[in-house]
Amino acid sequence: METGVPAHRILAVTFTNKAAGEMRERVRALTPAGRGFPIVSTFHSLCVRILREFGKKVGISERFSIWDRDDQTRAMKRVLKGVGMEDENPRLFLAAISREKGAGVRLAVYSEKAQNFRQRDVAKAWELYGQELARASALDFDDLLLKVHELLQNVEIRTLLQNRWTHLTIDEYQDTNAVQYEIARNLTGEHRNICVVGDLDQCIYTWRQAKLENLLSFERSFPGTRVVRLEENYRSTGTIIAAANGIIEKNQNRIPKLLRATREVGEPLYLFEARDETDEAWFVAESIQRLLAGKSSAKEIAVLYRDNFQSRVLEEALLALGIPYRVIGTRFFERKEVKDVLSYVRAALNSNVSVGAQASSEERRGLGNVQDISRIIATPPRGIGQTTLAKLLAGKEADLPSATRAKISAFRELLLRMQQALETIPLSEALRFILESSGLERMYKEKKDREEAEHFENVRELVNLSVRYDSEMPPIGAQMLLEEAALQSDQDEIDDQENRVSLMTVHASKGLEFENVFVTGLEQGLFPSRRLDENTDPEEERRLFYVAVTRAKNRLFLTFARARLRFGSREAAIPSEFLSDIDERLTSWAAVGAEAESVIE
């Protein structure tokens, strides 16, 4: 902008809504008033924006919906049941499909190359899953990228977008996959004004098809590139940075760099050897209790682990000591009560979308897609069950009793009134109408238990959140809310004002920082994980540990157990090989009891 580039010609892309929000705030602080504002977006939000505008060119309705993980899982369950594979894990099939889509592989190509029974099963499930998406006029996350990649093969649209955004910048470039690379390359075009920020040492998503090669080969892909090495670290103490350097330098497949701390040396890294996972959890909880008794704030403390199952025993210890905490990964928009309301919104907006290939257009009129209808038709109960819905979807409504047909007609009328509200009044008012007319509000108020009261508070919070879209022309605000819900990541759940200890996987911690960090479960087979197969990069586990270590600003605690309960049996444990990568002069064995209090002081 200082060189005269108009703000609206600049496109900045990152991976999470939280990161995009922080980027917007920083750009806003740097931008003089009246100079305009660049587009700052996540990859998936950018793709939604492009598909809303040009999607018809690739057969996408401008009113398409986006399926989240729960929507995808339920659809895959139906698919597998339909082909006699109901005992199979739908998430494994979805992961296999996502892996291929992320690599840019199309169904036709995959089907042609399928060599064994498993691959042929995946190909069949993929085909039927695609049909489910099409019937619902929906896209999953991978489709958002693939459809934009397909769209950019259109010379007219590609040229238009290249002229719209003449300067492209991408953060966390090491996390891009093959399709995202192609999108970036196509948007850059002849002007070649592209700036990327990336760190190979933090590439921890190759299992999601992130490609190290995108960053390693950047200078070959874009000749004339100028490389700026960012090696000064302003976050962590000198001791933490020295440990991080010692850990990551063991990896071979990286661009060499040596971080330099700008801060003081600081405290040593504290090691603790526990008897078992319970002893480890109590050490963590009691250490946090001492930190809180000192000058530390709960929101500046994080407990990290390799796998989600490790959180249970940690939660029990924190609860026992009355320490407030939150588990990152339980997303607001994935809570059942919130998804119920969103399903009403989506069903009302898409009330003319087909939900049964065998049903006539007259019989389908007034209903949304089967995912949402099956979720809301009995929430709250209205005398229409899943058996009735199955007959309706099969085009057998005429076979139903007249009383049941009357209930279906009333339900259609209800959706129509909701659709009218969403298309005419501000979104928050439309949501209040949906809560009242659907009976959801009455259902929650009639249930007196504490859990239901909390559910209703979550629904009310959804209404509060929707106010931000009230200024949008209906029904655009509703579509934007649905997009926000579908594209949310774990990190977007984090409220910086909430004063609680954070529990999360190391993957979820990427991009975050805390004054005090506990990295738990540092044992062979757990961290590094034993879940390594022939396609897994063994260096990625070390990169993951490097990410964990560099989340800490002031204090870092590294814990491991001599034995751990795994799959119902007590197993002896061996300390993680990563611990031996740290110079022992940087570490100190953590004290317990009264001695520990003097250490914290």
Cite the ranges covered by each PLM segment.
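Helicase P-loop NTPase motor core
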Residues: 223-226, 231-325, 347-362, 366-367
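P-loop NTPase Walker
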Residues: 1-62, 66-67, 136, 159, ...
